[in-house]
Amino acid sequence: MRTTFMAKANEVERKWYVVDAEGQTLGRLASEVASILRGKNKPTFTPHVDTGDHVIIINAEKIHLTGNKLNDKMYYRHTNHPGGLKQRTALVLRTNYPVQMLELAIKGMLPKGRLGRQVSKKLNVYAGAEHPHQAQKPEVYELRG
């Protein structure tokens, strides 16, 4: 009788990928990157082990939103003080904090717990085209579709 393969955390080989966000739709990019971070693109995927790869996203300031979401989509945060609910439109967030916009979308698609926090540390997002991870020799990842 055969048993199901279970990956061990210390046996996982991790790659580095570069994804160019220029002209990409926010949600479609985020779902594919979340899948790579979890390791779902590997045959050795194990749900309770971090088997994913590192992802570097460049040109976050050039991400695309469909429809009228730039003006209609709101991002909320709270200061933890009474009456401290703050809100920003997607246009303001993309203009002033483009990295935060992508990180929020991707982290929302990851598990909520210890594994999700561990997986999200492998995400590196940069507003421009430059990144400081050349020493890791990242591969260019072509998105589907």
Curated annotation (Swiss-Prot):
UniProt entry keywords in alphabetical sequence: Ribonucleoprotein, Ribosomal protein
Gene Ontology molecular functions: mRNA binding; structural constituent of ribosome
A Pfam family assignment: Ribosomal_L13
Cystine pairs: none
A Gene Ontology cellular-component term: cytosolic large ribosomal subunit
InterPro entries named among the record's database cross-references: Ribosomal_uL13, Ribosomal_uL13_bac-type, Ribosomal_uL13_CS, Ribosomal_uL13_sf
GO BP terms: negative regulation of translation; translation
Oligomeric and partner information: Part of the 50S ribosomal subunit.
HAMAP family with a match to the protein in the record: Ribosomal_uL13 (MF_01366)
PANTHER family: LARGE RIBOSOMAL SUBUNIT PROTEIN UL13M, RIBOSOMAL PROTEIN L13
Family: Belongs to the universal ribosomal protein uL13 family.
Role according to the record: This protein is one of the early assembly proteins of the 50S ribosomal subunit, although it is not seen to bind rRNA by itself. It is important during the early stages of 50S assembly.
The name this protein goes by in its record: Large ribosomal subunit protein uL13
Provenance organism: Bacillus cereus (strain ZK / E33L)
